[in-house]
Curated annotation (Swiss-Prot):
Belongs to the GAGE family. Residues 31-44, 86-95 have a biased composition (Acidic residues). Expressed in a variety of tumor tissues but not in normal tissues, except testis. Residues 1-116 are annotated as: Disordered. The gene is GAGE2B. This gene belongs to a family of genes organized in clustered repeats. They have a high degree of predicted sequence identity, but differ by scattered single nucleotide substitution. Their sequences contain either the antigenic peptide YYWPRPRRY or YRPRPRRY which is recognized by cytotoxic T-cells. This is G antigen 2B/2C. Antigen, recognized on melanoma by autologous cytolytic T-lymphocytes. Residues 102-116 have a biased composition (Basic and acidic residues). It comes from Homo sapiens. Pfam families: GAGE (PF05831). Coiled coil: none annotated.
């Protein structure tokens, strides 16, 4: 390869940007979900805004108690049949086991294997 002239690369000078001035004290309620707002949102009574974790547990217990035992639908994705490609995470973020090698067809059998 031959040299065709001068390089056009020129490093840009570094710019110093001054940080913004602090206008006043930072209010933690703007940045944290743990701090309760001064006024409750519309449609929500103020008495139920105690602890989000405790409130969620109470809702879960009430919902499951009225419906009875749930079928074992957690082992598979709901509404999606298994395609034989279980290399993605499940609906709850837990990894699924790889398919059984005895059940998986090899490409030598005439079919293409799907890739994730």
């Amino acid at each position: 390869m031959s040299w065709r002239g001068r390089s056009t690369y020129r490093p840009r000078p570094r710019r110093y940007v001054e940080p913004p001035e602090m206008i006043g004290p930072m209010r933690p309620e703007q940045f944290s979900d743990e701090v309760e707002p001064a006024t409750p949102e519309e449609g929500e009574p103020a008495t139920q805004r105690q602890d989000p974790a405790a409130a969620q547990e109470g809702e879960d217990e009430g919902a499951s108690a009225g419906q009875g035992p749930k079928p074992e639908a957690h082992s598979q994705e709901q509404g999606h049949p298994q395609t034989g490609c279980e290399c993605e995470d499940g609906p709850d973020g837990q990894e699924m086991d790889p398919p059984n090698p005895e059940e998986v067809k090899t490409p030598e059998e005439g079919e293409k294997q799907s890739q994730c």
